Design a protein with these regions (language model features):
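N-terminal topogenic module of multi-pass integral membrane proteins
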Residues: 1-76
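Membrane-interface helix-boundary motifs at transmembrane edges
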Residues: 31-46, 76, 102-110, 147-154, ...
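Juxtamembrane "helix-exit" motif on the non-cytosolic side of transmembrane helices
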Residues: 31-34, 62-70, 122-129, 167-176
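Aromatic-anchored segments of alpha-helical transmembrane domains
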Residues: 52-59, 116-127, 160-172
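Membrane-proximal helix-loop-helix units in multi-pass membrane proteins
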Residues: 83-151
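C-terminal transmembrane-bundle signature of multipass membrane proteins
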Residues: 149-205
Length: 205
């Protein structure tokens, strides 16, 4: 099946938003350079994270195009799997790992955790053994680390956006109403906004 013009006008701009939203980190890093130097391990790693997060969104767009933007339980964009969908999940994981390393990479355990999750991700994705577990672990670690570094409760809205992502994705699979496709993408990609706000508020608030 294909989405109609009205649904296209809702879904496609949100995917462009998801592709471009990581770029908000770049001016924030430049403007708060000295602040970040005193708070986190390596600020320049955020630039690499932006690349991988955008690459992940691009792979997702490619897979959605192959699925004609109509997500079902059987489609690769839903609960199925494919090369592009796997690259999407892997790239997002790498981007999140790089953010965590940039925040607290001076802790040896963080390096080993990130390496371990990156190595096992392709296997558990292919086998469908808790495929969201690595992203859940690294997302939780990022949020908690950012809170202790920047002391801004706004960062906990990342948990809210994750919860909404799960709710809307499940509704999408159950109903095949593609309106939830847009909501899922919007919530899933907006977590980076709360990291941006936490750093801005901590540096300039």
């Amino acid at each position: 099946m294909k989405i109609d013009a009205k649904m296209s006008a809702w879904i496609l701009p949100i995917h462009i938003y998801a592709l471009l939203i990581p770029l908000i980190l770049i001016p924030m890093i430049v403007q708060n350079e000295s602040f970040l130097d005193g708070r986190i391990f390596q600020k320049h790693f955020f630039f690499y994270a932006v690349f991988f997060l955008m690459a992940g969104s691009l792979f997702e767009i490619c897979q959605n195009h192959l699925d004609e933007w109509y997500v079902t339980d059987d489609s690769a964009s839903g609960n199925g799997y494919s090369l592009f969908d796997g690259l999407f999940s892997f790239s997002i994981l790498v981007g999140q790992c790089i953010i965590l390393y940039g925040l607290i990479g001076n802790i040896s355990l963080v390096k080993y955790l990130c390496l371990f999750l990156i190595l096992i991700m392709p296997f558990i994705y292919y086998k469908k053994i808790l495929p969201f577990l690595p992203l859940t672990i690294i997302g939780f670690a990022n949020t908690i680390s950012a809170y202790f570094l920047f002391e801004q409760v706004v960062i906990f809205l990342q948990f809210f956006s994750i919860a909404l992502t799960v709710i809307f994705f499940n509704k999408l699979i159950q109903t095949e109403n593609q309106f939830y496709h847009g909501l899922t993408t919007l919530c899933a990609s907006s977590g980076i906004v709360f990291l941006y706000l936490a750093i801005e508020l901590s540096a300039n608030g």
